[in-house]
Amino acid sequence: MANQLRERHQSLKKKYGELIDGDPSVPPEKRKQVNLAQLLGDSREKCKKMESEIKELQQRLGEVQGDNKLLRMTIAKQRLGDDEVGKRHFAPHEREDLVLQLEKAKEQIEAFEHDLQASLDELQDVKQERSFFQDKAERLNQELNHVLGGHEKRIIDIDALCMENRYLQERLKQVQEEVNLQKSNLVKYKNALEKRRNSKSNTKLSSSALTGVLSAKQVQELLSEEHGCSLPATPQSVSDLKSLATALLETIHEKNMVIQHQRQTNKILGNRVAELEKKLRTLEVSGLWSLPGGRDTITLSNPSSPSRGPKSLIPAFTDVPHHKPLTNEEHGQPGVELGSPALDEGSDNEAAKQLANSQVPLGNTYDNTYLHPFIPLLCQENEDLERQGPEIAKMTQELTAGEIEETSFEIPPDSQSTASSQENHDNLQSPFSSPEPSGAMSKKHPDISLGDENIVPVPQECADEITAGSNVNQCTEAQHDNKDCWEIEDCDSSEKAANNSCELIERCNRLNESVS
C-alpha cells in the first residue's frame, strides 16, 4: 500500500512538475516571471466570468422583484375583490406611515385654527379699543372746543394745538431770555444814572473819567481826526479811552447776543414752517385740500361736493356744512385786541372800538367761515391792518423825527450799545417782542402756507406788524417818562424801523390781494 502511494506521488509529481516549477528548459530566474504572467491572465479571465455572472444575477433579481410585486397585487385583488386597486393599494407599513402623517397634519390644522381664532379675538379687541379711543378723542375735542368757546359743530384738532403749544413754549423761552437781557440793561442804566447824579458836573469831559459815561458828542470828539493825535498823555485821557473801549466792547457783546437770539428765532421759525408743511402735505394726500391754480393761491376742498381725490381717513364728524360767520355782537364776546398790550391808549381804544362796532367776522375766534375744521381759514383781520397801516407808518415817522431832535442828550456808552442793540433786536425779532393776547391768534389760527416755495405765515405776519407798532409806542412812552435814561439816537436804525413797517404793510396788502 505504501509502495503504491509512493508511486502515485512520483507520477503526479512528474505530471504537474512543469506547472509548479515551470518549464525545466527555462532558466530558474525566468520561471518566476512566466508564473506571474500566467497568474495575471488567469485572474483577468476569472474577473470577466464573475462580471458576467453578476449581470445575470442582477437581471434575475429584477425579474424576481417584478414577479413578487405582481404576486402581491394579485393577492390584494383576490382579497379586496377590486380589479382597479392598482396604485391605491399600499403595503401595511406604508399605510401606517401615512396614518401617522395624517394624524400630525390634523394636529397642525387644529393648532392653526386655534391660533386663527385667538388672532380674530385679539383683532376684535383691538377694533373695540380703537373705537373707544376714537370716541374718547371726539369727546375730548368737543370738551376742549366747549372750554375754548368755539362752535359746537366745528371741532378743534388736538394735534394742531399740541404743535402750537410746542411752538409757543419755544417762543416763551426766547421771550424770557430777552426779558433777562433787558433786565441786565436796565440795571446797567440805573448804575450809570446813579453815577451821573452823584457826579458834580454833567457837561465837562473830565467827569466822564469819574463816572465812566460818555455822550455821543464826546465820543465823536475823541475819535475825530483833528483831536485824535493831539490828546495829552494824561491819566484822564487814558481813562477816557478805557471807558470808550469798554463801551465798544459791551456793544460788540450785545450785538453778538442779538445775533445769537436771531439765530435761535430763525431755527424756531424753521421748525414751525417744517411742521406746517408736513401737516399740509398730509392733508393734501388725504384729499382735504389742493393747489390747482397759481402758486400764490389756496383752494380748499369743499366737503359738501364729492371729492375726486383719495378718501379721507378722518372721522365723519369733520364733515361740517358752511355757515354764516358771526360778528362780535352776535357772538356775545368783547372785542379782541390784535396788537400788544403796550400800545398807546388812543390807538388801542380806537382799534377796540372799530372791532366792537364792525360787522367783520372775528379773527381770533372759532366762529369764522371754515371749509373744514382741520383747516382754519385765513382770518379777515388784514382789513383792519390795512386801516391801521398808515397810522403805524405815521407814528414811526414821528418817532424818527423826535429821535433826531433829541440827539443833544448825553448818553452813557452802556446805554448807547444796549439801546442800539435793543432797537435792532426789535426790528429783527418783532414776532417775539410782545406775546399775542392769551395765545388766541396762534392757537386758533395756525399759519397757512401760500404757494409751493414762498411759504408765508400770514396771521403771524400781521401780528408782527402790530407788535412792531407796539414796540415803537413803547419806546415813545419810555422817552416821555424817563428822559434821564439817555436813550440812543440812532437815525439809521429808526429809518430801518420805518422802512420795515412800511414793507410789512405792503406785504400784508399783497398777501390779502392774492388770497382774496
From Swiss-Prot:
Residues 1-195, 259-286 form a coiled coil. Transmembrane segments: none annotated. It holds the Pfam family CC149. Residues 414-436 have a biased composition (Polar residues). It comes from the Eukaryota. InterPro entries: Coiled-coil_dom-contain_pr_149. Residues 1-29, 321-350, 406-452 are annotated as: Disordered. Keywords: Coiled coil. Residues 1-18, 321-332 have a biased composition (Basic and acidic residues). Belongs to the CCDC149 family. This is Coiled-coil domain-containing protein 149. It comes from Xenopus laevis. The lineage of its organism: Eukaryota, Metazoa, Chordata, Craniata, Vertebrata. The gene is ccdc149.
